[in-house]
Amino acid sequence: MPLSVAGLAPFTVAGCLLAIAASAQVVRQEVPGIRNFAKVESTVACAGAITPGAIEEIKKMGFASIINLRLASEQGADIEGHTAAAKAAGIPYYHIPFSTATPDPAAVDTFLKTITAPGVQPAFIH
């Protein structure tokens, strides 16, 4: 029986990123305003929380876009601040709220469509 997107929901976006990390050489570095920065490969970097002030640095590092998977309810998420900072820096910013506790197949679909769209990579995902 073929799997549907709903059947794949337990295999979260985070799981996909871990699989990429396992197959690539992960480069970690300290970047002010970015927690746990790791460049997974030439087209993707992942991190934990960031500050709006780090967005200009993300653009300077050569990323074409920022994909934020955090829920607006998370402490320090500051979606509005990130959106404004990305607009000021001239870097596309995508907010795709994703809960690992209750994965939403629609969010997974949106992420996959976004990350594979022309001009999105290299992407900074957090």
Place the predicted regions along the sequence by residue.
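Bacterial N-terminal signal peptides that target proteins for export
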Residues: 1-12
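Cys-dependent protein tyrosine phosphatase-like superfamily
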Residues: 16, 20-123
